[in-house]
């Protein structure tokens, strides 16, 4: 039986939740396949004050409604035909979230490769890649994590958590450079990881 995480998606800061999600096991159970992978990269989006956040300045549309729900709600949006998986944080009405940017595949790896038409680290080393690999779509938008087909359970512990500015956030004043991206240092499945930066598995997991 899977063991669920004890992550509190409401009381800690969104930045802290983004850190806590690293190493956790993301599981998607479809009617035909079980997919899972360890989360290795996340980004925090801090709500109405964050110029890079969809809910900046209190923006609220039907597409964004899931962001305004209670922490632990799944928020899936589409960007350039790619689905992006987020976990909403904080209390209802405080629209913050963590974007899941990359995972290390564990279960269903063969089918993941078929879904992506890719192999190796390119299968899940990006937010749109992992959702396609794991068949995560807008159908999951608005559900609560661990109460349906999408779960997050205990996994591994990162040796070192690295921090950087978020990816692809231009022209957002001070928010462009804010260090709100978190990743497992040296992990090959982190997006944009250079070969010279990749560590041995014993070095990036405890």
Could you describe each region identified by the protein language model?
Residues 1-206:
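Conserved, well-structured core segments that form or line functional sites
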């Amino acid at each position: 039986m899977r063991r669920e995480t004890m992550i509190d998606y409401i009381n800690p800061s969104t930045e802290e939740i983004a850190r806590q999600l690293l190493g956790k096991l993301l599981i998607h159970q479809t009617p035909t396949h079980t997919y899972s992978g360890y989360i290795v990269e996340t980004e925090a989006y801090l709500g109405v004050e964050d110029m890079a956040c969809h809910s900046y300045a209190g923006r609220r549309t039907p597409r964004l409604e899931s962001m305004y729900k209670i922490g632990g709600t799944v928020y899936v949006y589409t960007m350039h035909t790619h689905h992006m998986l987020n976990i909403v944080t904080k209390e209802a009405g405080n629209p913050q979230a963590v974007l899941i940017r990359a995972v290390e595949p564990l279960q269903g790896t063969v089918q993941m490769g078929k879904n992506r038409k890719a192999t190796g680290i390119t299968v899940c080393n990006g937010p749109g890649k992992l959702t396609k690999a794991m068949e995560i779509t807008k159908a999951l938008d608005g559900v609560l994590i661990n109460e349906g087909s999408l779960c997050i359970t205990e996994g591994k512990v990162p040796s070192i958590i690295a921090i950087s500015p978020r990816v692809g956030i231009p022209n957002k004043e001070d928010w462009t450079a804010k260090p709100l991206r978190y990743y497992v240092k040296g992990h090959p499945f982190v997006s944009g990881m250079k070969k010279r930066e990749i560590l041995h598995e014993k070095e990036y997991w405890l």
